[in-house]
């Protein structure tokens, strides 16, 4: 079979495409490298600055279009598949839908139905837009709620893509739950794929101070809650300077991020929403992930035995106590590291995820004879 992925986030589609190729299929990923993050794509199409950059970007896509026909599945990264205004995105989407067998819209990040599920349906105890019954009113939450719920062209494209895609895919618990809430008949869950390297050497007993790593994207500080996490980590480091080492990476390319994280004991990832690629990268390296890991996320994976992540509550004192426990008891990290590696291999191995993705074809053929 032939698969085309348009747009990516954190190498998720690129890793899935690798798995599909190893299973004997054709797969192509087109997108951007993500500014300073420098992600992997097969064909890089990035928009340059100014009017000239916009024209060149449009021409590149127009030249590519004739080559993007005849695929079994075209998978769009929500509305982030191209850097155009909604009206032009719709034209490209409709063209690709017409000239390929099936189209899937995958939610890998923010989108109309995700924001709608958080703000209007209030599906979650905490999210990018609420903590319990209290709305988050920071600049990011307010701006994103307005953009995804109140901008007519954005809403119109979101509805069009959701209604005309043959399937909708959520890659994390919240994304799946929001899509399923509004489109239960056509929503599927496919886990994030992860390559699992050979078992690392640092999964034995922690020697010396506990090494805690945090990666920060400055422009997404409030969204991810890393402003709060960094504040808690500084306090913890001040209280236990001899028992922990704190490492911070800010706006670094993907490969450098992985190098800086290697050898850490704990990754402190994010608040408000469930674990994603950063946590999986860490776990595959034998690093314990401190993130959001609610029971519903494990249940969606049918996981009933292994719960290796440190589940962070959305309050500073709770975060402090969770992390303090491991700073004071580093001997408990070794088993959590082993469980982390096993969890990723069992639930997120890229070849297994590729097989799950391929199984969507049966549902597509059944629903669209």
Q: Can you describe what each PLM-predicted range is?
A:
Residues 39, 105-151, 219, 294, ...:
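Acceptor-binding helix/loop patch of EC 2.4 sugar-transfer enzymes
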Residues 62-70, 91-102, 128-167:
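Membrane-proximal helix-turn-helix segments that form the acceptor-binding/catalytic region
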Residues 114-115, 145-187, 231:
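A short, active-site helix/loop in glycosyltransferases that binds the activated sugar's phosphate group
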Residues 188-224, 230:
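Conserved donor-binding/catalytic core segment of Leloir-type glycosyltransferases
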Residues 262-273, 287-288:
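Acidic donor-binding loop of glycosyltransferase active sites
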Residues 288-297:
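Short hydrophobic beta-strand element within catalytic cores of glycosyltransferases
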Residues 328-362:
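A charged, aromatic-enriched C-terminal amphipathic alpha-helix characteristic of glycosyltransferases
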């Amino acid at each position: 079979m032939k698969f085309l992925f348009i747009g990516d986030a954190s190498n998720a589609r690129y890793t899935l495409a690798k798995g599909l190729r190893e299973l004997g299929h054709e797969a192509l990923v087109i997108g951007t490298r993500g500014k300073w993050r420098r992600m992997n794509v097969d064909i890089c199409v990035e928009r340059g600055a100014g009017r000239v950059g916009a024209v060149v970007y449009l021409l590149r896509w127009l030249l590519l279009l004739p080559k993007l026909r005849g695929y079994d599945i075209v998978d769009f990264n929500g509305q982030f598949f191209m850097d155009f205004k909604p009206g032009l995105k719709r034209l490209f989407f409709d063209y690709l839908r017409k000239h390929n067998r099936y189209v899937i819209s995958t939610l890998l990040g923010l989108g109309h139905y995700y924001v709608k599920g958080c703000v209007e349906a209030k599906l979650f105890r905490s999210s990018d837009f609420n903590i319990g019954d209290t709305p988050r009113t920071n600049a990011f939450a307010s701006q994103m709620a307005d953009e995804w719920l109140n901008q007519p062209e954005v809403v119109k494209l979101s509805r069009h893509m959701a209604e005309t895609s043959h399937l909708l895919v959520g890659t994390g618990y919240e994304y799946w739950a929001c899509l399923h809430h509004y489109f239960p008949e056509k929503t599927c869950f496919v886990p994030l794929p992860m390559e699992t390297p050979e078992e690392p050497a640092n999964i034995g007993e922690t020697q010396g101070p506990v090494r805690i790593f945090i990666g920060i994207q400055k422009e997404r500080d409030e969204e991810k809650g890393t402003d709060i996490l960094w504040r808690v980590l500084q306090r913890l480091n001040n209280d236990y300077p001899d028992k922990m080492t704190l490492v911070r990476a800010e706006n670094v390319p993907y490969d450098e991020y992985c190098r800086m994280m290697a050898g850490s004991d704990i990754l402190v990832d994010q608040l408000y929403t469930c674990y994603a690629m950063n946590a999986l990268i860490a776990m595959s390296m034998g690093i314990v992930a401190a993130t959001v890991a609610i029971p519903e996320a494990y249940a969606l994976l049918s996981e009933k035995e292994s719960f290796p992540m440190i589940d962070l509550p959305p309050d500073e004192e709770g975060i402090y106590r969770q992390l303090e426990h491991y700073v004071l008891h580093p001997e408990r990290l070794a088993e959590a590291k082993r469980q982390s590696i096993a969890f990723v291999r069992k639930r997120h191995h890229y070849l297994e995820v590729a097989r799950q993705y391929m199984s969507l074809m049966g549902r597509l053929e059944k629903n669209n004879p």
